[in-house]
Amino acid sequence: MAKLSKALLERLGVAAVTEHANKSETTLRANIPVGDKGISFDGEIEVFKDDTESVQSLIGRVPVQVKGTQVQEFTAGNRTFPTGMDHFQNYYNSQGVIIFVVEIKRNRESKVFYKQLVPTEIHGILQEYGIKKGQGQRRIELRPISETDLASVCIKFMNETKKQPLMLIENKPFEREDYTSYEMTSLTFDPSIGNIFEHDFTLYGVKEKLTVPLDHFRIDALKSEIIETIIIDGVSYELFIETTNMEKEVILLIENSLELNYTIGTSKFDFKLKRLHSLAAQLKVLPLVLDLLTGRNVEFVQLGWTFDLSVTEKEREMSKTYKRLYRTMLQLKEVFQQLDVDETTEFGDETIERNKFINQIDIFNKMMLEDDRSNFKVEFPEEAKYIGFNIGGMKFILFYDPYSKPIFTNAFSQNISNKRISVIYNDVETPYTPYTLFDSQSLVCSCNVNITVIKESFNRIDPFVNDEVAYISNDFCLTCIHAFDLSQNEDFLELADYIYSKYQGDTLTPEILYINQTQIKKRREGELSEADVHRLFSIKQEHAGDIGMNFCTSVLLESKVEAKLLFDKLSREEQERYKAFPIYKLYYDMTATVLV
């Protein structure tokens, strides 16, 4: 290919850009001299409101650089071009530039490509590739002008650069959490015709009327959530799917469990069980998997996909494995019904190897459905007791009785709550509830805990009948308050309040009872009534010498400095004891940011 001279390429390049300016419906005036170029910039394009080209009609000026390059054939799609870091710095200092690369054939035909370089993008290039990586140049990607028009390119550039003052880019005046909203813009993306993965975007943080440029990026993936209908050989499944769309691949996460990968343009897909997630998820996806392994045709209705399926020997073997897993999950469904556990409860920790995880479920099923404890060790197996069992992150509380059938039962079933348990005090046996044996962690973390059953168990006893029983009941109420602090489940506050409502005697110190009831109210409502404040103040006056009681009232009255002074007066042992009480949570939250 005979080479054209650099001077000719320059003239032809400028002429091609000028021709686009002259043909624009919006009045553009290209001031791009030939042979007398400045440093980094070749000239400018003026944009006018009308064709008078008067002072009054001038909208603005766009700095430009034009590069002519000879080619044998025009580039299809986008093309790249190298630019030095020193030029990037000059572009940044001048608030951006539009670069034109004009491909020119031997016969003088030309094709114009453009790149709008705005300050946020240039700043990122200088920081990442110039300063951090020490590169001397960086290739930029240019788009064909034929996909748009020069006036639109210039006007969008001017509007975008106005939103990107260098002071905001460099100083980052706010933290991310300070912005009330975010907005995203693109100079080139047209949703009706464009591939979003081929375009650049700028992210702005919005604070009141100010928009602050935060980042310039290209989208790698788009996530969305849909309810999809999948039809396999006429059998229909309606499933929740998280879709991740990438330039060449789509990943579906079905019911947070089954991952399906499809390479765009092919006729096949792969799938795997990424995680178990929950029993509900498995009861939905495993029948789907079995049909995928044995079916002939599958249609994804909303996505518009249709695939022909084939059954290989490998898939037949996989089908056997998934059938066993499905049987295991159906058995677990029966166990969950016994334990009154929600099937949508997530299994939680799935970091252990998949087969070991499933083995845990098999052991649990055999314990609950077959009284088989051969794979579960019970200490002192001759004694009836409450025991715990874990599946991943799920925790269950069971009642174990070696002399009954079944051996393992739900600790919160009506049969268990009716079992006789007693508190012996001064040789007097008093009927009591078994549920005060559980600590706050067990109440919060065990997925078969039934607060209604616990509450009803207190209806069959007097929880404050004597000093010992009252002490246990009060301690359990504090456990319930702590359980609320761990979980934010207000049912625990209601349970504690309900138990306290049964108090009628003289087995508790009235002031302690009132402080604990006020703790519940403080957590529920966030504030106290005027009557509460007066009552707490009276308690402070009546018990001026009781440091612990004064500490509690000061916390509830939000006397931050006084509460800290009183806590510091407690002995080290007393401080450790109070740290285990729910009142300390209120104290800690109140004083966490207070310096004394």
Predicted regions and their residues:
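Elongated alpha-helical scaffolds
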Residues: 59-124
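Catalytic centers of nucleases
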Residues: 4-82
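Extended non-globular C-terminal regions
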Residues: 238, 242-342, 346
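Charge-rich interaction segments
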Residues: 140-257
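Long, low-complexity regulatory tails in eukaryotic proteins
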Residues: 301-596
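Compact, glycine/acidic-enriched structural inserts
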Residues: 115-156
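General N-terminal leader/first-domain-start detector
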Residues: 1-21, 161-176
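Short, hydrophobic/proline-enriched secondary-structure or compact coil segments at domain edges
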Residues: 101, 265-279, 473-484
